[in-house]
Amino acid sequence: MKHTNQQGVAVIMVLLIVAIATTLATYIAQQQSLWQRQVESQFDRAQTRYLGTAGINWARAVLADDGASSQTDHAKEMWTLRLPAIPVENGEVIGAIEDRQGLFNLNNIVRNGASSAPDVAQFQRLLELLGLPPHLAPALADWIDEDTEPHPGGAEDGYYLALARPYRTANRPLTELGELVRVKDFDASIVARLQPFVSVLPKTTKINVNFAPPEVLAAVIKNMSLTDARTLVHKRTETPFTDVADFTNALKQFGALQPVVNDLTVNSQYFWVTGHARVGQAQVTTQALLYRLNNWPIIVWRSVQ
């Protein structure tokens, strides 16, 4: 009987050892598979980030080549074409370059630290064309300018410090469009309405008349109607303007308009680059603001998500 019991214990021990060994082997295999997937995932993520950076450098090279060969930027140039999905190993990459100087630069309304009345008036006209209250313009000017005296309809520190969650005015140029929600009477819906027509650029810029939408043209050219601006944009689609003089000549058909030619250009320096890369299950979206200086664009701002 004792011998039988010993045999039974031995069998149980063998079964236990086999079970442990089997479980351990399964665990090791699972861990190896998990480790392999993690390594592959990390590699894929690293590769997508690399492709995102490569996309920005591609855009810089394209814009540098364009700047070296032409002093006029318009929608018929090759760089405006969206990069189609290019296959890469186990994935793809897509990219696009957009002009940023056809939009109204919100930072233009303050120059050398002081509110610029002509630019504030232009922004007010744009607001009215978009069905938004014009007093948003002086409110933004007060947010950006360096003084503490509020404009009519605007607000300085006294207004913001009285809020439930007080803060002060920035007294500096905007750094991003989303900052507008901190300005008196702006909200997310107003920002969304403005987004297709405005930019936030670090320097004072001119409007590229070859890219400006009708609303922006009607805002920066006093007494120009939106209907006439749309007619001009239709003409531009067929034949881009070669220089500012070409543009002002085209304005003559609409009467005695007097644009401020120093505010206009046909050459852009700021561009927005968007890229999307996918490798395996990893995806990354890259955005960058480029400034073309002496033909070779520098990166002003970049985001990788």
Predicted segments, located by residue:
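Compositionally biased linear targeting/interaction segments
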Residues: 2-305
